[in-house]
Amino acid sequence: MNLELSTPLELMGRSAEFQRIVEVLAEDGDLLIAGVPGSGRRTLVRRAALAVGAIILEIDCIRATDGERFVQLMAEAIAQNFDAVKIQDWVASSGKEFFRFQMQENSSIPTGKLTPMRSLNPKQLWQAFELLLGLPQILAASENQRVVIILQSFPHIRSWDRHSLWEATFRREINQQTHVNYVLIATIAETTHHSEETNYPLETVQLAPLARDVVAVWAREILQTVGLTFDSRSKAMQLFLDAVQGHIGDAVAIIRRLQALRRPDGLITEQEVQQAIEELLKDLSITFESLLMLLPGNQVHLLECLATDPTEKPQSREYIQKHGLSRGGSLQGALTGLQHKGLIYGAEQRYQMALPLLALWLRQRLS
């Protein structure tokens, strides 16, 4: 039996955020969704886009390593979601200097592949980008539909878009379109300093960790659908809630393990929860080890400190002296770096670890 983890948003504790996203999209607004990985960012945006009847175009900005790759990914998303014949007509009439479209013959429904021409020089690539930005509006208007462009991990493009030219142009052009909205997904709600931020402000929705009682209700509802329940005579539920710390992604991972460990009576005891956690940490250990190897040494040290000795004031003199942390800019840089990577929350969440299973693994590793 497969565990069905889709659940009403009311049980996920995100109904207010969901409603706000729907309202903004319905009013032709654009959004920034800020939250750590596993907080439900993409699920919320996808469901909200479907709720307003929009076609969804998704671009993973981690894969967009430069402007050319960004154009390629955007072209792919458009080709996968719109009428191939209309795209072919657009290329023939407006885009043949910069794009080519290859119709796929082995499908009952016409599909095709839209790609930028090879070896475009920087000026041509920029022209291709500006031209492509107008295509979703043309296609959406022809079908009388809305489009929501979801840019996952959006801040990654700033590694090559040093002066925010691509970002500013994208936001300006989409803002002027009547059938297209965009949603930026990031770990923190940082602000930029270019003029487009003032001219075209974003509605920001921040996803904090879920409350314990919300996770408890969600977990009970999910487990009941497959005939499982926490043993009320044990501390199984408390152990589960302590482990996930309001992180829906980690909660899902543990619940999947609990299903595999089911007892004949359907009860989940502390033993099953502990076993599920231990097995999960064992499977994740290579991933966590690799993550630490990619982090600067001062970030690793700070992460270990926050996992083993949580504090609301990592910049305090006492905490710095206790753990041998660097003072001043180096410490602040490490805090900011860990926030950008989605590994810790900021001051508003008391600098707690954002990935509870990573925190648990670090504590076991250092004990």
Regions found by a protein language model. Give the residues of each.
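A short, conserved structural fragment
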Residues: 339-349
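P-loop NTPase nucleotide-binding core
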Residues: 23, 27-148, 153-157
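Short amphipathic alpha-helical interaction segments
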Residues: 323-341
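Helix-loop-helix "sensor" segment of P-loop NTPases
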Residues: 191-242, 263-266
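Sensor-1/coupling segment of RecA-like P-loop NTPase cores
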Residues: 35, 141-143, 147-151, 156-162, ...
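A short, basic N-terminal segment
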Residues: 1-36
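Winged-helix-like regulatory helical subdomains adjacent to P-loop NTPase cores
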Residues: 250-326
